[in-house]
């Protein structure tokens, strides 16, 4: 028998949870800039523009922003700015589209590896973390993210609160909890059954699914509660207990049902998959993106290219897990699993990219501290990409994966004015993106840390 979704209990709990989080943290996280939107028409004087429509840079450009969208992108020589217009001087900076991270967990903290937190933390802990992490992410230059697993429906509520202007954060493409088999990477394993029954009785109703009928039921229930994207777990994981990263956890037929059900509901679907067979099963099933893809083999690379499947490979966080997570109580079992897959993942990233597989930027933020997302660019360049290719993976390619190319991902007329700037050249040193000086989202400035913050009027 398929359990019914506990609609009233969950909805009331989440509403109360987010309301409390918002009330407590509003004074601390609200951005002063968010209260002062730019005037109706604003002109950005741009020294160097990487618009992500190609790999080149345009110099001495002007971006005209009207309300929340880009009105025009023009050579400075071809545009006469009206006297007294509002002008933002970025003539000494490199300007880029707002960055996109396709694999985040906004409700997670990177200092919560000790299993004791399963018992100490409450849903409020995750809500507070989500509010803070959303702002950190935006101020790091990531104006859009895809959240692929925050329990229970935290990302949905964060998305709504940000869209309503009540909280500060990036645009969020939100999933519900990652869907898992019983005893899989998304389940709570190696505890007494009484722990599950007493402490997490509702969790199974909207994330644990065994067999085709339960998969359909859970996906439809998540769509009912407002998710933008579905996340399903195809193989074991690194940070879970009692499973192997290489082992498949859903059959090919079950994954086909998941993809069909998600697509029927107008949602894309992402699959957590480290293991070789689980990766190939997910590709053959019609899943839109493979998360991690650590142990992908040559056949998997060929299949991904043939099917146009995106790989989202989080090749930075291996360093954080091995060097920092032990301080926060990560068990030896999980460290051993990370040692098994982390280095292989990086070499397979190189092979997949060289083979021409579609790649989108995603970091697993929450495994490491939110706000450090841009540290992954260095590793993407180290393992085969040019800086321009790595940036496009986090802009135009990422926008394509999350289904938002009409609005974000490049700097072009008609798109949202999601614009960042750095006072260095990231095409020469991609680590410049670790220090974003200027962030605009939807025409509103949320960060301005340029050495010269003068907003001069036009001559």
Predicted regions and their residues:
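Divalent metal-dependent hydrolysis catalytic cores, especially in the metallo-beta-lactamase
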Residues: 129-155, 168-178, 227-240, 268, ...
